[in-house]
Structure formats: structure tokens, C-alpha cells
């Protein structure tokens, strides 16, 4: 896939950026409006170090947005199946 065509590589629409650094960005997902963490590099390969960093950053944002223990990290790739990204979703959501 040409990375210029990947919506998570270009991130032309940025809603409510919660955090960003050279490796990742956390912003509100345009389709479901919950915090979404995106690894900047177009990859699905996840090292242990990447997993630890992504989990820690998204948990910190989730605690701020939803409160302690009121959210979970959804690691399922849906609309963009080939670019690593996760969502912080409310525990009150019915779909998992």
C-alpha cells in the first residue's frame, strides 16, 4: 500500500490532540470520537517496547477522559486494518 493513501499516515483530520511525540499521537477518532493512539510509522509490527509505551500513554489519556477503571483499550483494527492504532473506549459501551 502506498503510505500516502493511508488515512492514519497522513492524519489530515486531527480532532482534539491529547498527546504527540516522534513515535505516536493520541487524538479523538474521527469516526467514533474516542481517544485513539496511532503509531506514526505505517506498520502492524509491534515490539514489546512499543506495546509498553502505547499502553502507558493511552491509559494515561483514558484515565483523564473517562476516569479510573471506566474504560478499556480496544486493540482491534477495524476501519484501517493495516496501520497500528488502538482506541480507549468507555466501559459503558455495549460493543466489544
Locate predicted features.
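HIT superfamily nucleotide-processing domains
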Residues: 1-96
Amino acid at each position: 500500500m502506498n503510505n500516502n493513501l493511508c488515512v492514519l499516515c497522513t492524519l489530515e483530520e486531527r480532532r482534539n490532540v491529547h498527546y504527540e511525540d516522534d513515535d505516536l499521537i493520541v487524538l479523538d477518532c474521527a469516526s467514533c470520537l474516542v481517544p485513539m493512539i496511532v503509531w506514526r510509522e505505517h506498520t502492524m509490527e509491534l515490539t514489546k517496547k512499543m506495546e509498553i509505551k502505547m499502553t502507558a500513554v493511552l491509559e494515561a489519556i483514558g484515565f483523564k477522559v473517562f476516569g479510573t477503571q471506566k474504560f478499556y483499550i480496544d486493540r482491534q483494527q477495524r476501519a484501517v486494518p493495516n496501520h497500528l492504532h488502538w482506541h480507549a473506549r468507555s466501559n459503558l459501551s455495549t460493543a466489544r
